[in-house]
Structures are given as structure tokens and as C-alpha cells.
From Swiss-Prot:
Highest rank taxon of the organism: Bacteria
GO CC entries: plasma membrane
Membrane topology: Multi-pass membrane protein
Gene that produces this protein: cdsA
Keywords for this protein: Cell membrane, Lipid biosynthesis, Lipid metabolism, Membrane, Nucleotidyltransferase, Phospholipid biosynthesis, Phospholipid metabolism, Transferase, Transmembrane, Transmembrane helix
UniProt-listed Pfam families: CTP_transf_1 (PF01148)
Residue ranges of the TM segments: 13-33, 78-98, 114-134, 143-163, 176-196, 199-219, 244-264, 288-310, 317-339, 356-376
Protein name: Putative phosphatidate cytidylyltransferase
GO biological process: CDP-diacylglycerol biosynthetic process
Top-level enzyme category: transferase
Protein's organism: Mycoplasma genitalium (strain ATCC 33530 / DSM 19775 / NCTC 10195 / G37)
């Protein structure tokens, strides 16, 4: 190996270590911001909450609530740090995208970047003010969902309107704006999963993205013969297939490890007349499956455990497909504008968007899934912490 190759590997390794340290710091802050799940530092005794059982319309709900009200201000403070970190990263992704698309309009690219940053940062700070210090009820949830939807539509219109001043074809305007929208939704989703659903949730999602990227590359390089798509000949059907299968196995194993009630006290219920015996809490001690896959909203009772795993594996598969789709989509955009990397912000690793291309589609998918599933089920609101449901018709006394 010559000196140039050694320097290249050294620089890539240095950047990788730096990114890993930043991600670990991000997880730490996420843990400090999260007082909702059993792994939170603010629940070190594992008994600083109560699980209340409610029953209505034949459905038994087990609701986890935080007892110590003093932690709200602390959690809110750390949530702001999460918002700022994600806001900066998301804005860098938008800036890299539009800087390459609108090459002769740097001021316009900067304006679009600042617009995104403003909506993400101030919008989510306002959201968490309500979450922590007021009541997140159905009315607020409806207003937030409508506001989020209108923001996405408005941003999409603004993106296309700005690009219409150039000679970019309308079909390409739609593609470019879709990439920007994915970055925006992924930023909101990352904040949501990190703070409301906990650091274990965002860790599992990022593990899914890294796993499918890594295994697809390794298997594709070794066994790949059939290109997945012409714009990216290095990605093959063989690599994608083995990448998805390997990811399903890896993430399923992580789910199994998370389901082990390690350092988690037996849930206590503030009812003396009995408890719902067949609740998701019995299978999901760390709230992980409920947080990410929302299977508890779909099925309950005696068939819940089997249905839980079948649905979970199906969603891991779907998420893996979206991750590969994000990688291919942004490769397509780079091919259209004739660039290798979106920027050199991360040196030999390229730009921020080059590192989070697959994650942007993956997290966007899961966030929209949460938004839709919560609305359709009409059981747990989007910003409500860890509420469990089982379709049980009676509570045993």
C-alpha cells in the first residue's frame, strides 16, 4: 500500500471516529432529555413512575406516567440541545443539496436553508413547550398534525417556485424538492424519536440504516453481479437482498436483547382491583417495540405476541427498503448534477447528506408511519409518551 492510500484510509478513519463520538454524545443528550422510558437517568430507581390501567369501549390501556414533575424543566432543557444539533445537521443537508442545484444563486440557497432551520428549530421548541408544560390533547395533536402537513406542502411549493426561476425541468424540480422534503421530515422525525421515544429508539433506527448500508455494500462487492439500477452500478440486487435479510436478523436480535427486563423493575399498577395481564409491557420492558413499531395499536390479547413479531419483521423489511431507496435516490441526484459528493464538509467522507442519505428516507418513513398510525388508531397521540394498549375485554380482579 502506497503512502497516498495510507493517508486516505487514515483521514477516513479519523472522520469516522469523530462522527462516532458525536453520535455517542447525541445519544447521551437524548437520554438526558428522555424521562419517559425506563432507561432514563431521571428514573434511576426504576420506580419513579406509575402505570395506570384504564378501560373504555372494551379496550384496556396501560398508561405510563412520570411522577416527579420537577424533571420536566430539566428534560426540556436537554431537548433544546437535541433540537439545535438536529437543526444544524438538517440545515447543512438542505444547504448542500441546494448549493449544488442552484449553483449560481448562493443567496437563494442560503435563504432556503435558513427557512428550513427556522421551521425546524422554532417549531419543535414550541412543540416541546406544550409537551412538557401544558397538556398535549387531541385538539393540540390535530392542530400540530395540520401545521406539519401545511409546512411540508408550503415548503414543497417554495422549493419548486425557487427552482422555476432557473432552467431546470419541472420533472427534475419535483425530484430535487422531494430530496429536500425528505431532509426536512427526517429532521423533525429525528428530534421526535430522540426526545419523545428515547435514545434507544433512535439508536435502533440508526443501527438499521448502518446495517443495511454495510451489508449491502459487503455482499454486493463480493457476490454482486446484477446492477440494481443503472445510475449506481456499484449497487446490486444481490447486495440489496442479502443486506435486507442480514438487517432483519440483526435488528430482530437487538429487539430481543431490548426485550430482556435488565435493570427494569416489575411494572406496578396504581389499581387494587386488578391488572391487565396480557399487555405489551409484559413483552416490551424497555418500551422499544411500542415506541418504534406501534404494534400495540393494531393487535392485542392472546394473539398479540405472535402478531407483534410478524409485524415487527415486516416493518424492519420495509424500513430497509426505504433506506436503500434513499441511498439510490440521492445517488440519482448526484448523477444528474454531475458530482461525486454533495460537499467536503466531512473530508474524505464527503458531505453530511452523503452520510445520511439512507437515514433521511428511513426516518421519514417511520415518522410518517407514526403520524398516520396514531391518527388512525385514535389511541396514542403523536407526542404522548409510551402508552400501551391491549384488546382485552375485561380486567381480572
Amino acid at each position: 500500500m502506497n503512502e497516498k492510500a495510507k493517508q486516505f484510509i487514515k483521514k477516513r478513519t479519523s472522520v469516522f471516529i469523530a462522527l462516532l463520538v458525536v453520535f455517542c454524545f447525541f445519544l447521551l443528550i437524548s437520554a438526558f432529555a428522555d424521562g419517559f422510558n425506563f432507561w432514563s437517568p431521571w428514573s434511576a430507581d426504576f420506580n419513579s413512575r406509575t402505570l395506570k390501567v384504564e378501560q373504555a369501549s372494551g379496550v384496556t390501556s396501560v398508561i405510563s406516567t412520570e411522577i416527579n414533575e420537577n424533571f420536566k424543566a430539566v428534560r426540556f432543557s436537554f431537548s433544546i440541545i437535541i433540537i439545535l444539533i438536529v437543526g444544524v445537521i438538517g440545515s447543512l443537508m438542505i444547504w448542500e443539496l441546494f448549493t449544488n442545484i442552484l449553483k449560481n444563486k448562493p443567496k437563494l440557497s442560503l435563504s432556503l436553508t435558513l427557512l428550513n432551520a427556522g421551521i425546524i428549530i422554532f417549531g419543535m421548541i414550541g412543540t416541546f413547550v406544550v409537551v412538557y408544560f401544558y397538556k398535549w390533547n387531541a385538539t393540540v395533536n390535530g392542530i400540530w398534525t395540520l401545521s406539519f402537513t401545511l409546512s411540508v406542502v408550503l415548503l414543497w411549493i417554495i422549493y419548486i417556485a425557487c427552482m422555476s426561476k432557473t432552467r431546470i425541468k419541472f420533472s427534475l424540480q419535483l425530484s430535487y424538492s422531494l430530496g429536500a422534503i425528505a431532509c426536512f421530515i427526517a429532521s423533525i422525525g429525528t428530534i421526535y424519536f430522540s426526545v419523545i421515544r428515547g435514545w434507544t429508539t433512535i439508536f435502533l433506527l440508526m443501527s438499521l440504516a448502518v446495517s443495511v448500508d454495510t451489508f449491502s455494500f459487503l455482499f454486493g462487492k463480493r457476490f454482486g453481479k446484477n446492477p440494481l439500477i443503472k445510475i449506481s452500478p456499484s449497487k446490486t440486487w444481490e447486495g440489496a437482498f442479502f443486506g435486507i435479510i442480514s438487517t432483519i436478523v440483526v435488528v430482530a436480535l437487538l429487539c430481543v436483547l431490548y426485550s430482556i427486563p435488565f435493570f427494569v423493575a416489575k411494572p406496578t399498577f396504581n389499581q387494587t382491583n386488578g391488572i391487565a395481564l396480557n399487555t405489551p409491557q409484559n413483552y416490551d420492558s424497555h418500551n422499544l417495540i411500542t415506541n418504534i413499531f406501534l404494534i400495540a395499536f393494531i393487535s392485542g390479547g392472546s394473539s398479540f405476541y405472535i402478531y407483534w413479531w410478524v409485524s415487527t419483521l415486516a416493518l424492519i423489511f420495509t424500513g430497509s427498503v426505504f433506506a436503500i431507496g434513499g441511498d439510490l435516490f440521492f445517488s440519482y441526484i448526484k448523477r444528474l448534477i454531475s458530482i461525486k459528493d454533495f460537499s467536503k464538509v466531512l473530508g474524505k467522507h464527503g458531505g453530511v447528506l452523503d452520510r445520511f442519505d439512507s437515514s433521511s428516507f428511513l426516518i421519514s418513513f417511520f415518522f410518517v408511519y407514526h403520524l398516520i398510525a396514531g391518527t388512525i388508531s385514535n389511541q396514542r397521540l403523536l407526542m404522548e409518551p409510551n402508552t400501551y394498549f391491549s384488546a382485552i375485554t375485561s380486567i381480572q380482579s
